[in-house]
Design a protein with these regions (language model features):
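Short catalytic micro-motifs in class I SAM-dependent methyltransferases
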Residues: 76-77
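Class I SAM-dependent methyltransferase SAM/SAH-binding core
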Residues: 10, 14-60
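A C-terminal cap/extension of S-adenosyl-L-methionine-dependent methyltransferases
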Residues: 162-216
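Short alpha-helix
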Residues: 139-157, 163
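Conserved class I S-adenosyl-L-methionine
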Residues: 100-129
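A short glycine-rich, Lys/Arg-flanked "PGG" loop and its adjoining helix->strand segment in the class I
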Residues: 85-100
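Class I SAM-dependent methyltransferase "Motif I" SAM/SAH-binding loop
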Residues: 5-9
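A conserved beta-strand element that flanks and buttresses the S-adenosyl-L-methionine
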Residues: 73
């Protein structure tokens, strides 16, 4: 598994604990340091399944041979890339035939939802005309449209196999709101999972999870 932009390693470590061989490709040296510390705290068997490389997800060809991975994850990264197509193509190149490319992106088709539901009408109106937005960190980033990414995936030989909505109901929750306790948490996750695979709800989710499969 290649995890591009693993951040603090929540996803990468979970996969390594499940027995997968995981390579993390991270551009931010601060995040690399945090992730190295997290890996060092794991048992030896898990540490042996983790490999960390400091590098840019747009330059996968400089680090890996074509067909090196069965799964490539790129979650929460494309919004920071001005032009996603070259990066997505590079990710697909390092996939083995039949391999899975998993993308998690901001949904440009629902970009007006959060500001609109919050009563921020100027931002909501602007979101209809531009995929650019300011995220919760105060950074200028961009969103992607599902149809556009689906066309990109088809063009690079990893056509879209399935897609889901993420954060249909919970996107307005503030970052400092405590995680619900059981049994509410289980009900919340069940509602999000159901909405994320059901029309029309998934189309207005804050994020899109797109799964492409590399042709043989």
């Amino acid at each position: 598994v290649l995890d591009v932009g693993p951040g603090q390693g929540t996803q990468a470590l979970r996969l390594a604990r499940l027995g997968h061989e995981v390579t993390g490709l991270e551009l931010d040296p601060r995040m690399i340091a945090v992730l190295r510390e997290a890996v060092a705290a794991e048992p030896e068997g898990i540490r042996e399944r983790m490999r960390l490389i400091e590098g840019d997800g747009r330059d996968t060809g400089a680090h890996f041979q074509p067909g090196s991975f069965d799964v490539v994850l790129c979650h929460g990264v494309l919004m920071y890339v001005p032009e996603p197509d070259p990066m997505v193509a590079g990710l697909a190149r390092v996939l083995a035939p039949g391999g899975l490319l998993s993308l998690l992106v901001r949904n440009a088709d629902a970009l007006a939802m959060r500001p609109g539901l919050s009563g921020d009408w100027d931002t909501a109106l602007a979101a209809f005309d531009s995929p650019a937005y300011t995220n919760r960190l105060g950074l200028q980033v961009r969103a992607d449209r599902r149809e556009t990414l689906a066309a990109t995936l088809a063009g690079i030989g990893a056509p879209l196999r399935a897609w889901y909505g993420v954060r249909v109901f919970t996107d307005l929750a503030e970052d400092d709101v405590p995680v619900p306790t059981e049994p509410e948490l289980t009900r919340l996750l069940a509602a999000e999972e159901r909405a994320g695979r059901t029309d029309p709800y998934r189309a207005v989710a804050a994020l899109l999870h797109l799964c492409g499969v590399r042709g043989g």
